[in-house]
Amino acid sequence: MRPTDYSTAWDHPPTRRAWIQHMIMIAVRLVGWIAVWVGSLGVLVSFLSPGFTPLFVPLLGYATYRAVLQLAYFRPSTTIQRVLRQYPWQFLMDVPRGRNKHPQVQEDEMWFEIPNPEKPEEQIPLLFLANMRTFWWMRRFGTSRTKPELKAQIEPLWFAGDPRFVAVVAASGRGGEAPKRLHLLYQRTATGRRGIAPTDWNASPAALERARRAGAHVPDPSPQ
């Protein structure tokens, strides 16, 4: 079966393995940066005089920053799993994309334009609102000088989700049968952050409920 033939992306075994590998790498990097911090402090305390402290402060600070950053990856990674459990993969070709500000939004971030699943003629900008792990994607979005083979690495675009709320994008792994570089995208109105009201995008009740199960914050159903 093709990846797009499964009822949800999570039913596709290579996708499950890709997500597990994604989580393992986060854990490995977290342990690694903690080990760097502990090891550096141990060397400073056990083998060096206090005069070397200023030399180690930047390293300890950077190791702390990187360890905290790995912790910050866990929550969006669990949301990735929730999205994959709700939506099937789609293979999208020639998806409109840009590195500069989209004319329909306020934020100056990279974006894809994805069709509204209930109104395919409507293109919805889906932004890279979280700046974590975006450099790989930014290089492949490219510019007029970017090599075509680099841009081709995100053709087709693996897409699972609803662009009105929350989605996962990925690139093709080796052989094209498994995803790699799983990345969470979402609308700011779907985050549930204080002061940001959710919006329903005129979505059907079924679409709203599906998005809610995928981890998006959506309005409560209107009373009948």
Predicted segments with their positions:
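Intrinsic disorder/low-complexity segments enriched in polar/charged and small flexible residues
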Residues: 12, 35, 91, 113, ...
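Short, glycine/small-residue-enriched coil/turn segments at secondary-structure junctions
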Residues: 84-88
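Acidic, low-complexity intrinsically disordered regions
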Residues: 6, 15, 29, 33, ...
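Short secondary-structure capping micro-motifs at structural edges
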Residues: 78-83, 142-146
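Acidic, Ser/Thr-rich low-complexity segments on the non-lumenal side of membrane proteins
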Residues: 89-134
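Alpha-helical transmembrane spans
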Residues: 10-81
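Short, charged cytosolic
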Residues: 1-12
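A membrane-cytosol interface segment of integral membrane proteins
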Residues: 126-216, 220-223
